[in-house]
């Protein structure tokens, strides 16, 4: 285990893996940062238990929407923007390997307060919405990107979740959602 130090000014809100690289949202710089997975493995091996300053080894890619959460699906980076009062947006990007630049392909309206996005192998889209530790979070399930694009306020299923349910991922037909709790009370000795 190693900790990588990133941009200290940013809210690093999302992370994705494309098979070769780890991508991290940097909302402060309005970009996503790419870190080679080989570098991460090397640092974990050589610097176990340490904090490694990785600011100089990341590649920054500017994006047209403020990155709040991110996923990799179908050869694309899907980057969503969190807003409070109006519909947010999600943009699908393609990495042009010749120019090493992200190319925006499609732009979608999505519900407000989106903090996580993922897809399953069938193309179903899952969005996690959350704001604060005292309000319920919601999981929105759509049959496809087309269903999301045409009816963002009408998911196939909407599930109430505990507060602060944010990032999510699908692996082996199982949806994983880490949940943060507002408080943990432990007994103390006086």
Regions found by a protein language model. Give the residues of each.
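Surface loop/turn motifs at the tips and blade-to-blade linkers of beta-strand repeat domains
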Residues: 3-7, 59-63, 106-110, 157-161
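Repeated scaffold domains used in trafficking and secretory/extracellular systems
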Residues: 9-14, 63-70, 111-118, 162-169
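Residue-level detector of Asp-centered blade-edge/turn motifs that repeat once per structural unit
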Residues: 17-19, 72-74, 120-122, 170-172
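Conserved beta-strand positions in repeat-built beta-propeller and related beta-rich domains
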Residues: 24-28, 79-84, 127-133, 177-181
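Short loop/turn segments immediately following beta-strands, especially the blade-tip
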Residues: 37-47, 93-100, 144-149
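Loop/turn-rich, solvent-exposed surfaces of beta-rich toroidal or solenoidal domains
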Residues: 109-144
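Conserved blade-ending motifs and adjacent loop-strand segments that build the rim/top face
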Residues: 149-169
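Conserved small/polar residues in nucleotide/adenosyl-binding loops
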Residues: 182-188
């Amino acid at each position: 285990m190693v900790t990588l130090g990133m941009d200290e000014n940013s809210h690093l809100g999302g992370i994705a893996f494309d098979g070769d690289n780890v991508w991290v949202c940097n909302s402060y710089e309005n970009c996503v940062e790419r870190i080679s997975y080989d570098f991460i493995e090397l640092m974990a091996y050589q610097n176990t238990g340490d904090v490694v300053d990785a600011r100089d080894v990341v590649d920054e890619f500017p994006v047209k929407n403020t990155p709040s959460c991110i996923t990799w699906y179908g050869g694309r980076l899907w980057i969503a923007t969190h807003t409070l009062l109006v519909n947010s947006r999600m943009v699908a990007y393609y990495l042009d390997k010749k120019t090493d630049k992200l190319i925006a392909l499609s732009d979608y309206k999505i519900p407000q307060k989106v903090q996580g996005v993922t897809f399953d192998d069938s193309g179903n889209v899952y969005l996690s919405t959350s704001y604060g530790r005292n309000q319920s979070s919601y999981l929105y399930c759509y049959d496809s990107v087309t269903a999301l694009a045409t009816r963002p306020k009408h998911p196939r299923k909407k599930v109430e979740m505990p507060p602060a349910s944010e990032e999510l991922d699908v692996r082996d037909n199982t949806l994983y959602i880490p949940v943060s709790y507002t408080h943990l009370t432990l007994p103390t000795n006086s």
